A protein has these predicted regions:
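C-terminal helical cap(s) of enzyme catalytic domains, especially alpha/beta-barrels
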Residues: 261-277
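Acidic/histidine-rich catalytic cores of soluble enzymes
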Residues: 28, 123, 128-227
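Alpha-helix N-cap and loop-to-helix initiation/capping positions
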Residues: 39-47, 76-87, 113-124, 150-158, ...
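Acidic (Asp/Glu)-rich catalytic clusters
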Residues: 18-24, 44-64, 91-99, 127-135, ...
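Conserved, mostly hydrophobic/aromatic
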Residues: 20, 66, 84, 95, ...
Length: 277
């Protein structure tokens, strides 16, 4: 099981890779630019090429990026949706330049326009983004959400519908354990059932990335708050079952736990202790 973490890039992309190596991780997730700002200076392509070479030499697989929190590809506001599409295309291009295998994105929010309208907007936005980056290889991974507010992507049927509408080999899925639990998928007492439901509505073949996070909130509470591994509502035994499940254990597991600057080593150790040979 490849284990990775979302690590800060405030000191540069190469510094994040060095930290991943010091933690004895197998893979890595990063932001390609600030996730809380629309604008960003152009990516230094020479620096990106150097990082890409170092990454390839490291033997780590995969490299995952996460896009901006501001992007809403499902927005009913045409101006905001266009701004989001443009920003998403920029994220895809940055991810490709850095050598990323996946770019994780949230499904967006319908903002009271209705789920079906939101899903249609999301699918159309993704089609445009993928068509305009058709010469690139990075895959876009739709992330399961906690279902807070009008956010799409909590029911598996949402993502299944979008996958069918977009019908692209470059569209993948990211399963976040905290989000799934908060959305009401009982991964504690019915993990096999949740996986079977996911397979029926989305398809396990489309699952590219796992986000491994414990949860601060209760099952079905729609609270998107991550907790340290084994210290939240999901707990160590359910985490053990997820990590070692025969249908999941081959996937890259990315930690997005709190206090990454000071507690990431603690969470890596907790996961390693739960892994079975």
């Amino acid at each position: 099981m490849p284990l990775g973490a979302h690590l800060p890039t405030s000191k540069g992309f190469a510094a994040a890779l060095l930290e991943a190596q010091s933690l004895e991780l197998d893979c890595l997730q990063i932001f390609c630019k600030s996730p809380r700002q629309w604008a960003a200076k152009p990516l230094d392509l020479e620096m990106a090429a150097q990082f890409r070479k170092k990454w390839q030499e490291s033997g780590f697989v995969p490299l995952v990026a996460h896009d901006s929190f501001l992007i809403n590809l499902a927005s009913p506001d045409d101006a905001l949706r266009k701004k989001s599409i443009d920003a998403m295309i920029d994220e895809i291009e940055r991810s490709e330049a850095l050598g990323c295998d996946f770019l994780v994105t949230h499904c967006g929010a319908h903002l009271k326009s209705g789920e079906e309208a939101g899903l249609q907007k999301l699918a159309a936005s993704l089609v445009e983004c993928l068509e305009k980056t058709a010469d690139l290889s990075v895959k876009v991974a739709l992330e399961i959400t906690a279902g807070q507010g009008t956010c799409l992507g909590a029911p598996f049927s949402h993502i299944g519908e979008v996958l069918k509408s977009v019908d692209s080999p470059r569209l993948s899925v990211c399963f976040d354990t905290c989000h799934a639990f908060a959305a009401g998928h009982d991964i504690i007492s019915n993990l096999d059932g949740v996986i079977a439901d996911f397979d029926a509505q989305i398809g396990l073949k489309n699952l590219g990335v796992m986000h491994l996070n414990d949860a601060k909130g209760v099952l079905g509470g729609h609270l998107d708050r991550h907790e340290h591994i084994g210290q939240g509502a999901i707990g160590p035994e359910a985490m053990r079952a997820i990590l070692n499940h025969p249908k999941l254990k081959h996937l890259p597991f990315i930690l997005e736990t709190p206090d990454v600057e000071t507690k990431i080593a603690q969470n890596v150790a907790a996961v390693r202790a739960l892994q079975e040979a």
